[in-house]
């Protein structure tokens, strides 16, 4: 008896769809459209641990030990870089504006706070409210943004965020009081929360696969560009009449750029496909990618992902999806690693340093103008760290850069704390204090005005020749008079160790910048 001939061998056994029944000859899903060989992949075949990866159309397990394995990609299978067109350029510019807005808001508040404190006579608690109101609103609206994105689409959410940010920036620029300023900061936080969540998602769903990772990372990198720009603007406007209003109000420019840009951009193809508008999704991908096979493959991947989400066997809704991800070992490990890195980045104090950089430098002994310019310089150090990380990540590896970043952050924070201890030790002693300046409101110290460091920490109080009395930036109030040879210190005390604070602040932000991008790329 002659044995039957063997079945034909499929050249691509790990296709998302079986070769004998492809969904359409126009949209083949091939392994060559994968862009990152370092990702763990699988198609939900023999290995239970690979279930769920088929939505990306990637390879399956190795067939031996039931684990996902990296995809093997030949050099000639890497998708070519897409040709630039007006839609792609608009996508890059407008998505970058979202990151720029976030960075500008962070940096400009640091430079504006010293001027706002003197103009509106803010207490330390009120200063904290000016900063934290934006952060709280950002957190709340980032949670709301997920539902809004799924319901209304990415484009309307970003347009709404741009409009909200514009209104908030105008409100801050004309704020006549503390309450008005906090309200404007809260409105801005709502815009930041919506845009910072939606813009990277929109880029990931619209950008060609060959440059998708770079564009998404670019949105994060633009945060540092916004911080540096804000520092320069604050330095130029510090000391000018109403300068802090212009600092805050100029945020209308990038918000207008983002709003106008997204007005002319199409909706996300992923959202269109999920809404049953497949023809529109195809037209959007063709517009962004050009009429190439890559556009067809991208549409096929989008349709496969949408079909996966609609499958009753797969979890629907954020809670069920999270439970499913946590119960899947490879996904759970990746989730713990990613969330852990992000938590470490936030817990190391980056928000405190960025929002209060100018205040920190004032406490270290620098005047208002010098403190604002130094905060711009340290923001530039973070930008250098980000750029250096992007250049070195493929050579040194992500793990090495993240470990070096964390070590540098730890050393710099310890050094920064030591430098402030030295500043207090070397501060001039108070021999006489007026009734208005005889107590330190901060609970960090003993509650007694003992040093120049304590004195200048009290609103409308300054130090000269052992006296702690009321005054302003230039003169002493009342009958108190400084000794002729004494120098009036209102914003900061003379500190021979101030250079230490500068060194450790620069090291801190340089180290953080290295880990900021490396952690995201990991």
Where do the protein language model's features map onto the residues?
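Short, well-structured alpha-helical segments
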Residues: 295-307
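Alpha-helical transmembrane bundle of multi-pass membrane proteins
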Residues: 2-289, 307-522
């Amino acid at each position: 008896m002659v044995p039957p001939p063997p079945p034909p061998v499929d050249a691509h056994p790990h296709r998302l769809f079986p070769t004998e029944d492809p969904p359409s000859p126009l949209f083949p899903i091939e392994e060559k459209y994968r862009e990152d060989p370092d990702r763990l992949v699988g198609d939900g075949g023999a290995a239970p641990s690979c279930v769920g990866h088929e939505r990306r159309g990637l390879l399956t397990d190795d067939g031996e030990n039931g684990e996902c394995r990296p995809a093997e990609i030949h050099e000639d299978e890497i998708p070519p870089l897409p040709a630039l067109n007006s839609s792609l350029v608009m996508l890059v510019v407008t998505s970058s504006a979202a990151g720029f807005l976030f960075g500008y808001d962070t940096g400009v508040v640091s430079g504006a706070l010293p001027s706002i404190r003197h103009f509106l006579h803010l207490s330390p608690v009120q200063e904290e409210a000016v900063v934290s109101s934006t952060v709280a609103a950002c957190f709340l609206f980032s949670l709301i943004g997920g539902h809004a994105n799924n319901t209304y689409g990415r484009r309307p959410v970003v347009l709404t965020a741009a409009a909200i940010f514009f209104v908030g920036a105008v409100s801050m620029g004309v704020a006549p009081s503390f309450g008005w300023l906090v309200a404007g900061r809260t409105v801005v936080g709502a815009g930041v929360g919506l845009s910072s969540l939606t813009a990277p998602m929109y880029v990931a769903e619209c950008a060609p696969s060959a440059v998708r990772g770079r564009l998404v990372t670019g949105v994060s990198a633009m945060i540092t560009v916004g911080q540096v720009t804000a520092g320069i603007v604050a330095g130029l406007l510090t000391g000018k009449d109403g300068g802090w209003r212009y600092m805050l109000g100029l945020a209308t420019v990038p918000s207008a750029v983002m709003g106008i840009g997204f007005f002319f951009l199409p909706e996300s193809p992923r959202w269109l496909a999920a809404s049953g508008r497949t023809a529109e999704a195809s037209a959007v991908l063709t517009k962004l990618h050009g009429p190439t096979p890559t556009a067809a493959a991208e549409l096929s991947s989008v349709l496969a992902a949408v079909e996966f989400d609609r499958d009753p066997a797969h979890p629907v809704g954020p809670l069920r999806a999270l439970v499913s991800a946590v119960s899947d070992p490879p996904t759970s490990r990746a989730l713990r690693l990613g969330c852990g890195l992000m938590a470490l980045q936030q817990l190391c104090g980056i928000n405190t340093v960025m929002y209060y950089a100018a205040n920190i430098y004032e406490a270290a002994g620098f005047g208002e103008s010098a403190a604002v310019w130094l905060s711009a310089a340290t923001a530039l150090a973070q930008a250098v760290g980000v750029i250096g990380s992007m250049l070195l990540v493929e050579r040194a590896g992500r793990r090495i850069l993240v470990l070096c970043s964390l070590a540098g952050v730890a050393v710099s924070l310890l050094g920064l704390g030591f430098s402030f201890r030295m500043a207090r030790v070397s501060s001039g002693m108070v021999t006489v204090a007026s009734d208005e300046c005889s107590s330190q409101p901060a609970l960090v110290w003993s509650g007694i005005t003992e040093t120049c460091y304590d004195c200048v920490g009290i609103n409308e109080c300054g130090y000269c020749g052992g006296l702690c009395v009321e005054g302003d930036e230039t003169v002493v109030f009342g009958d108190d008079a400084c000794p002729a040879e004494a120098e009036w210190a209102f914003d900061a005390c003379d500190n021979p160790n101030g250079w230490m604070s500068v060194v450790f602040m620069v090291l801190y932000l340089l180290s953080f910048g290295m880990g900021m991008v490396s952690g995201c790329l990991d």
